[in-house]
Amino acid sequence: MANLGEIVQKVRSKNAGPFWLTVDIFCGTPHAYAHVIAKLSSATVAKAFGMNTQDIKRFDIADLHVVKFSLPRPHVQGSTLDPDMHGASWAALLAELPLEN
């Protein structure tokens, strides 16, 4: 079983405003894209981040071989409780997620 980061070209996360984060998965190839959309569910992402599935928005962008997840920030960006103002560390968590072959 390989980690998501070993299968795809790049996993990136960033701000999507003060209340949302976005995680972009650049698959690189049609094969990797097909594998990711088949094996990585919104429920799996929600569980990895300790969130409810219905709070996760998923966008499959076939022409670019990209899967994008938008999720609510646990704390408002820049608040004293926000440990990652730029939202960059979320990608590392998802990249380490094991995916079935």
List the model feature ranges, each with a label.
Residues M1-N101:
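Long, contiguous binding/interaction regions
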